[in-house]
Amino acid sequence: MEKVNEERDAVFEDHIGDRRRSVRSLLEEAFADEMEKTSYDVEVADTPQPHIPIRFRHPPIAGPVHDVFGDAIHDIFQKMMKRGQAVDFCHWVSHLIATEIDEKFSEVAFRDVQYNPDIYVTDSTTEAKKLFNDKIWPAIDKILQQNAETCPILSEKWSGIHVSGDQLKGQRHKQEDRFLAYPNGQYMDRGEDPISVLAVFDGHGGHECSQYAAGHLWETWLEVRKSRDPSDSLEDQLRKSLELLDERMTVRSVKECWKGGSTAVCCAIDMDQKLMALAWLGDSPGYVMSNIEFRQLTRGHSPSDEREARRVEEAGGQLFVIGGELRVNGVLNLTRALGDVPGRPMISNEPETCQVPIESSDYLVLLACDGISDVFNERDLYQLVEAFANDYPVEDYAELSRFICTKAIEAGSADNVSVVIGFLRPPQDVWKLMKHESDDEDSDVTDEE
């Protein structure tokens, strides 16, 4: 038995880069309360239960069968993030847990149900949502208790670019932002796709559309990647995946009467080809940081932009100044978005895209919501990265997004705030660049290939 335990521990170890924590230790840390309860809590018969007030909630509308698995993965991801774990680990383990529940506890293989625009089946999906929620800890317990011969080799997953991602509710009553930060395709389906995918979705009129986008972009991305034409550029693939995502979201919005929508800023990174593509709708910005500055790669889709204003009016819309800012038909201060079905065609669902080479002087990509860009310009962002690198060790690189979000709230941002960062060079290079050292030492770093 001792030998089996040693082998099992070895399987869970991780030695790649500076990600020195084992996956086993991360799981045990995240679920410490459940493990403690399992080890010594014993239910005593006839023990009176404390009074718990019951809040009435309207029963949820049943979603379609083809969305159950993606919805479950995002729900688990959100729960893992609340337990304080790094975003890349949360992505990987949310897929692992959802797959374990789907295979071991569910009578229906929801992972295998494909999207079909002509079929909208909702049978048993409410029960399925409850199943995926209730079986998170049992699934983790099974994963931890598997013997060495059958447990997944988790160390294979620690690959791809380094990422950081976080969000804060700020002064808003509800959190309508969502995000994702996949270091590569291995975090989605255990495949070998090397492309990294990052995104921020800023919801409005409810969280439904932003949550749907974060839960299902990985599905449409993989579908496009698997069926891509050799002539399709990275930019084409990202655009197609967003268009397919919006198609699916539109069906769900109509069926469930969603009235809101979401901005989107997405980035696909191919480190092998030294290329990155961005696709966006709305005013959530995307930046790249070089050795000397941040520069914005996206253009905000708002009524104040002359081209966007002209398109809205040509589509039959009107622009009104409400509360000191232009709004489409007096309602929305955006001209493009995912969802917002009642506002079409004035509110366009067509993403804008670009593809740029990754230069040797580029260090990281940063995606954010307007809660960040409303209070920080490009120079501010550079100084925040510099301040973090000088105050914290490089091992804390995953906390950079939380640091920027916190500083945005302190600077007076009244919105939800979200930041996702993809490192185009190892975090150690960013720290060397930003450390307050001599000019000679700094110039040596910036000249590195």
From Swiss-Prot:
This is Protein phosphatase fem-2. Mg(2+) 1 binds at D202, G203. Residues 28-34 are annotated as: Interaction with fem-1 and fem-3. PROSITE patterns: PPM_1, PPM_2. Component of a complex containing fem-1, fem-2 and fem-3. Interacts (via N-terminus) with fem-1 and fem-3. Component of the CBC(fem-1) E3 ubiquitin-protein ligase complex, at least composed of cul-2, elc-1, tra-1, fem-1, fem-2 and fem-3; mediates the ubiquitination and subsequent proteasomal degradation of tra-1. Interacts with tra-1. Interacts with sel-10. GO terms for molecular function: calmodulin-dependent protein phosphatase activity; metal ion binding; phosphoprotein phosphatase activity; protein serine/threonine phosphatase activity. Belongs to the PP2C family. Binds 2 magnesium or manganese ions per subunit. It is an enzyme of class 3 (hydrolase). Mg(2+) 2 binds at D202, D370, D415. PANTHER family: PROTEIN PHOSPHATASE 2C (PTHR13832), PROTEIN PHOSPHATASE FEM-2 (PTHR13832:SF741). Dephosphorylates auto-phosphorylated Ca(2+)/calmodulin-dependent protein kinase unc-43/CAMKII in vitro. Involved in the regulation of sex determination. Together with fem-3, required for male sexual development by promoting the proteasomal-mediated degradation of tra-1, a transcription repressor of male-specific genes. Promotes apoptosis. Residues 160-424 form the PPM-type phosphatase domain. Its EC number is 3.1.3.16. InterPro entries: PP2C, PP2C_BS, PPM-type-like_dom_sf, PPM-type_phosphatase-like_dom. One of its GO terms (cellular component) is protein-containing complex. It catalyses: O-phospho-L-seryl-[protein] + H2O = L-seryl-[protein] + phosphate; O-phospho-L-threonyl-[protein] + H2O = L-threonyl-[protein] + phosphate. The keyword Magnesium applies. Residues 54-56 are annotated as: Interaction with fem-3. Keywords: Apoptosis, Developmental protein, Differentiation, Hydrolase, Magnesium, Manganese, Metal-binding, Protein phosphatase, Sexual differentiation, Ubl conjugation pathway. Its cofactor is Mg(2+); Mn(2+). One of its GO terms (biological process) is peptidyl-threonine dephosphorylation.
